[in-house]
Amino acid sequence: MALTAGQAACVNTLDAPLAVSAGAGSGKTYTLTRRIVHALESGFIDDIGQVLAITFTSKAAGEIKSRVKGALRAGGMTEQALKVDDAWVSTIHGMCSRILRAHALELGIDPAFTVADEATVKTLL
């Protein structure tokens, strides 16, 4: 799949954070995947652990991880591919939960907490 000019700018702009906003089916997942892989292949970053990618859905985060893992394997970057499942690619809720769990004892919260869904919140209120 060839990149559009806008997608290519996203992939090749590695020295600044980006927000990618576009409609369904426009190639956001593909573009973010290519950007992450390009950052590793070019040596801009040394490890997939240096990536933070926030998506709106867990499904999209899973798809990005799957595609990045496949591209890294195909490019001979097996060690990095093995680390993708632990990469910081998630929803904003997933990222915040991960940070809270990592510091749960310091914060005085149960590290096995769950995030309340909308129905639970309504019940509690």
Question: Which residues fall in each region the model found?
Answer:
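P-loop NTPase Walker
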Residues: 1-110, 115, 119
